[in-house]
Amino acid sequence: MKYEHWQIPAAPEDAIKTLMDAGYPYLVSSVLAARGVTTSEQAAEALEREKTLAYSPFLMKDMDKAVARISKALENGEKLAVFGDYDVDGITSTCLLTDYLRSRGADVTMHIPRRIEEGYGLGCDAIRALSESGVTLIVTVDCGITGVDETAYAATLGVDLVITDHHECKEQLPAAVAVVDPHRPDCPYPFKHLAGVGVALKLVLALGEGREDALFARYCTLAAIGTIADVMRMEGENRTIVQCGLESIDRSDFTGLHALLREAGLTSRPISSIQIGFVLAPRINAAGRMGRAELAAELLLTGDPVRAEKLARELCELNRERQSVEQDIFRRAIEQMEDLPESERSALVLSSEDWHQGVVGIVASRLSEKFSCPSFMIHLSGGSGKGSCRSYGGFNLFNALEACSDLLVSFGGHELAAGFTIEERNIPAFRTRMNQYVRAHTGEHPPVSMLDVDVDLQHPSLITLEEVEALSLLEPYGAGNNRPVFCLRGATLESVQGVGQNRHLKLKLQKSRVNFDGIFFSVTADECGVCAGMRVDAAFYLQVNEFRSQRSIQLQLIDLRPSLDPSGRENEALSLCRELISGGTLSPRDAARALPSRDQFVRAWRVLEREVGPDGVSEPMLPLLRHLSSEMVGAETFLRTAMCLQVFAERGLLSIERKDTTLTLRLTADGKKVELDKSPYLSALHGFLS
């Protein structure tokens, strides 16, 4: 079980009926009603698909100054540079603005810092190199808001800066020609949650005043990819950008984007925000993480189909390399975490010289999810460390870093994700203070890992392929409009098996005579504490699986636990069986409840002789124990049967092998009479009870 608690709301039946009567499908109605939508008018508003952005870009502070300075550079033939970031938001921002400026005939170059050599944001070395190449105006995208010193240095070289960013601002802003950031305290722009690429799009729309519709149509797909990848709130203008971007992806003029979609296997339509976030974006991101962001930028801007195919293959290969490096760092980070005292586990602060700087951020995300706390991963080099951190439970990282700023060289980012630089000697003090800060702001006990379920599916027969396909009406998903979570309670786990080198689980569930196929990524059966035959509660996303042109319903599992319904007594007994057969011990209470009598040993042996035989039997544990317990009564007979098996094995009558959820039994008796009373295990049990 991944989550300590599931929040399952009561079904608002009246609202569901109202929405279904208005023509909305059952699943869509159930999700909307669970989220407070109770009338057809509210539903229409929630599902409305806007085609234009709501606010003028000139509502942003300094947008007029940015447009004036860039327009002057275009008129005078100045050399410009677009200075971006190496994540997907930064890469798409860089490509969007560069493509537009080139369409205006600008002499423009791109600069995306190499993550390892240069690090995040503006750098004086890069500014000097750009100046020496003749650049007189640098426009930043998705970075620059904390570049006070770098902006001042650029001024000494005669280089102007226009800063566009969407990160949190510090008290002092850079003294640039223009600083465009909706998070500026004095910025009146109504929507504060644009991605960096959203701000870049607004700049282009302002520069191309009078051609807004055509420019939005050209660039909304790039803007959608960056917005999804940066996990921005999926509401307001972000929702419009992503909806329009996904709808127009087939019509996009960007040759490289189509090549990457094909190479990533995204050939079916329509493309969803989930596919962008979990399939396409990681491949673009891999270029930046592995220090090759320029490859992704070249791919998105190339018009050469042959070059695009080659670059797309390279990005997919970089992503596979990133996955391998990530898994190794994750394993070693857990090993390091296990050496920390309990007082240093409210916030995980881990460091190593061996960790790839480009991958520590994604590992921090996995650690936060696994251990339910903020995580800080630091790559060390030459006495200094570059860190990436991820939040948990809404904890504000930016404020936490600000509280520890005297220990840091620099920091920046958002509430939920941030980066920082720290001297290696300060890491122990930083670890201590950050743990104290987290406890002070969350209490001594970390927040309980909570799974918010939208819909408890009471009527499995209503879950049809058409119903699942209709869930696309709720797209695009993201923060503020999460992908809906469903659950089935008291379902039977018909089968479970490892796939993908046993890194994932493939399973079959059944409830009310309706069968479902499911996949559970990055989890083993032992980690779930379940086996075939158990009654379980399953939480999942509903999706359509397409294989060899056949479409079917698939459950993408989020969590799986032994059923908490009244029949859970059976699961409790089975859990004890697994413990016993794995060589564990029982409490005196459990032993007393299930200690077999002599007659029960005899009956159990007869069942084994009849059902197992010399060739053995290998089956999922629960069905096998049910079968062998056929002459006994009550759920506790699972445990009693397991105790019989254990004693028989100890006395050389039986061999037992357990692998994951499968039990293999073979009779090994040679016909000699065996005294069960001499079993050390049985003697120990009698000792417990005497």
Spans of features found by a protein language model:
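Histidine-centered active-site/metal-ligand motif
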Residues: 166-167, 356, 414, 504
